[in-house]
Regions:
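Minor-groove-contacting beta-hairpin "wing" of winged helix-turn-helix DNA-binding domains
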Residues: 76-81
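Short alpha-helical segments that sit at the start of domains
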Residues: 1-29
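Mid-protein regulatory/catalytic core that forms ligand/cofactor-binding pockets
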Residues: 116-206
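Short, amphipathic alpha-helical interaction segments positioned at domain boundaries
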Residues: 85-108
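Basic amphipathic alpha-helical segments that dock to polyanions
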Residues: 60-67, 129
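C-terminal regulatory/effector modules of DNA-binding transcriptional regulators
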Residues: 180-270
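Short acidic, hydrophobic short linear motifs in intrinsically disordered regions
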Residues: 34-46
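A short, conserved structural fragment
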Residues: 65-75
Length: 270
């Protein structure tokens, strides 16, 4: 196991809207363009702009430092752990480059049998695959769009599950029922719809007059969706699927808020 300076825990269970989740969103958005460092005072101020009091803000900072995302540096400053950069870059691609499947795109099947003696590996593999948006075909067998192959390979390495897994790529899965019906079994479409509904409701509550807070809360609310929703092709989804509305809301608000939010951050961090 790596030291805190090299090992970073991806806090995938951080609930959107929580202090820890908002802090991670601020770090992911702004520490790299700020040069990788920020003062403790500036970080607490930015969290204050999100309505978070100093005490819980400092508690959250301590938590993400313990997770390895931040490193304490001299002068009451925090630096982004270089080991976290690949994780954040993967997140950028998923969050800002939304991709949906089209007819004829390949699928990736992941078959894994993890020994009982390594139950922790099995649990991590299952939870990470589900967060990645994989559907469950059968116990030990998952399916994703093939364009996620790189993320799946990284996940298998990070969870130490690669020796137990075999990957298959196909353009023509043939379940015993129509593929649309099979997809409804493999993915919990009701839960995915609820995530879209939650996001769209959160968008309605944003105050664009405070662009920094609105943008961070937009990103924090959105960040789960591009993971848990695999972007299935339209012909496998209900006719009233809300995915396109969510994407349009996110991209439109991002375009309106991002620049003003960045100006605010630079002013606080200067």
């Amino acid at each position: 196991m790596g030291s805190p300076a090299t090992r970073v825990v991806d806090d995938i269970d951080a609930r959107p809207g929580s202090t820890t989740s908002l802090l991670r969103t601020v770090i992911g958005l702004y520490l790299r363009p700020l040069g990788g460092e920020i003062s403790s005072a500036a970080l607490v101020t930015l969290l204050g702009d999100l309505g978070i009091q100093p005490a819980p803000a400092r508690t959250a900072i301590t938590r993400v430092k313990q997770k390895g995302l931040l490193l304490a540096t001299p002068g009451a400053r925090y630096a982004l752990n270089p080991a976290a950069v690949p994780m954040l870059e993967r997140g950028d691609r998923r969050i800002f480059e939304v991709r949906t499947m089209t007819p004829g795109d390949d699928w990736l099947l992941i078959s894994a049998t993890v020994p009982e003696a390594q139950r922790d590996v099995r649990h991590q593999l299952r939870s990470r695959l589900l967060f990645l948006g994989a559907g469950t075909v059968a116990p030990g067998l998952w399916i994703t769009p093939a364009h996620l192959a790189g993320e799946v390979e990284a996940l298998l390495d990070e969870t130490s599950a690669r020796p137990f897994a075999t990957l298959f790529r196909t353009s023509d899965p043939q379940p015993s029922v129509p593929l649309r019906d099979a997809a409804a079994r493999w993915w919990d479409l009701d839960a995915l719809r609820a995530e879209h509904d939650r996001f769209l409701a959160s968008v309605d509550a944003l105050d664009e007059a405070a662009p920094f807070a609105a943008y961070v809360r937009l990103l924090d609310s959105w960040r789960v969706l591009p993971y848990v929703d695999p972007g299935l092709p339209a012909e496998l989804l209900p006719a009233d699927w809300p995915g396109s509305r969510s994407i349009a809301a996110f991209t439109g608000l991002s375009a309106r808020l991002a620049d003003a939010a960045w100006v605010h951050v630079r002013g606080v961090a200067a």
